[in-house]
Amino acid sequence: MAISTPMLVTFIVYIFGMVLIGFIAWRSTKNFDDYILGGRSLGPFVTALSAGASDMSGWLLMGLPGAIFISGISESWIAIGLTLGAWINWKLVAGRLRVHTEVNNNALTXPDYFTGRFEDHHNFHGFRTRVVKHIACILYRHDGALCGIGSRHAQRHFLH
């Protein structure tokens, strides 16, 4: 593939923009709390946008179009169900979790929250949460790799 001038200029502008955003964020970050949660000063719109983008990245861009392509428009119920589930999560869980994370030693992660919430001095709940999270991450990456390899190849070599 030949490198064209517009492609090179676009790439350089993109890299410069990313470095600039990183520098501005670095200057406004004073401690680990600022880094991990934005100093708890992000508004509900930014928080919802960030959580939604993190949650929906893989299934929205790969899974949902693939399901609709293979099975037809009847699979659009997936988007409706997931949107409804996210809304219920924000209504029932998010506010209470925000309050409880501050009460439980200013927990910054879900394992830290469970450790503080259940007064786990041996960190059993935190360890268990981390193990489940890592297994889920491995399965997520494996699923992405299978999608990248291609369904025919994956079915032939990995699924039988």
UniProtKB/Swiss-Prot annotation:
It is a multi-pass membrane protein. Signal peptide: none annotated. Induction: Expression may be regulated by the Nac regulatory protein and the nitrogen regulation (Ntr) system. One of its GO terms (molecular function) is L-proline transmembrane transporter activity. The keyword Transcription regulation does not apply. GO terms for biological process: proline transport. Catalyzes the sodium-dependent uptake of extracellular L-proline. This is Sodium/proline symporter.
